[in-house]
Amino acid sequence: MVRLGGRRCHTIWRVFSQRERRDLRECLVAAAQVDERIGAAAVVGSGATHSEDEWSDIDLAFRLAKGLQPATVIDAWTGRMYEDYGAVDHLDVWSGSTLFRVFLLSSSMQVDLSFWPWETFGASGTSFRLLFGEANEPTSSSSPAPATLIGWGWLYALHARSSIARGRHLQALYMVNGVRDHVVSLACVRHGLPADHGRGVDDLPPEVMATIADTLVRELRRDDLTTAFTNAITALIAEAEQIDPGLASRLREPARELVRTACGPRAEPTEDALP
């Protein structure tokens, strides 16, 4: 047991409960309040909107004092997570000058701590609730650029085609999934839903979800891979049509060729499955 800011904070060593998650978050916030290098803190994600469920993680954003960078504080906070709360590993993700350090605890809880330079700390969406201190004026959140998503979609499709044709079924599965992932992101952007990591996919209209379901590989066989690939690239072209009809028109011919040659370079033309 450790004490932070007058609170008793128990080390977590088993599958976590919602109460344990709440207690740990309160302890981390209390520690931030007495850390002179932290000027403000906010809870982000589902915790900011009180929409957590039993599987939600802890997601806290810290505003560093003026002139400080994440390297100034990260070692102390990392030590705290390992020594007091049973962290077993962590992953660093940088976004500009902001460091997101993602911890995995022995209880299987995920704890995301982000360290923001003074001048960049602030809300970029609705999932931001200030706990103490002050934040900069909110900025508009940015969705992935649709043209970039389309580009990644056809790039995965190129490699899906060659993987199927070479009989490399597991690699083909990976590539077909990549096409589908970008179709999902495009659909989420189009419907105003969170586009990262499939967060909005289950809130898409039923007909869109049905189209996405058709891109799943049912069995690891050439025929099933080819069917899923055809459906995935068809869905990609359909999403492109919603955003840039001219681009969709230019992509149709190479898309048809990808589907045709997925069975090998000498494959005969088949019935046109693309719109």
Predicted regions and their residues:
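Residue-identity detector for glycine
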Residues: 5-6
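Metal-dependent nucleotidyltransferase catalytic core
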Residues: 9-36, 47-49, 55, 62-113
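Hydrophobic/anchoring residues in structured secondary elements
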Residues: 40-43
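Short aromatic-enriched loop/helix-cap "lid" or pocket-rim segments at secondary-structure transitions
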Residues: 53-56, 124-126, 201
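A short, sequence-level motif marking secondary-structure junctions
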Residues: 115-120
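A short, charged helix-loop
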Residues: 122-148
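Conserved nucleotidyltransferase catalytic core and NTase-mimicking acidic/glycine-rich helix/loop elements
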Residues: 138-275
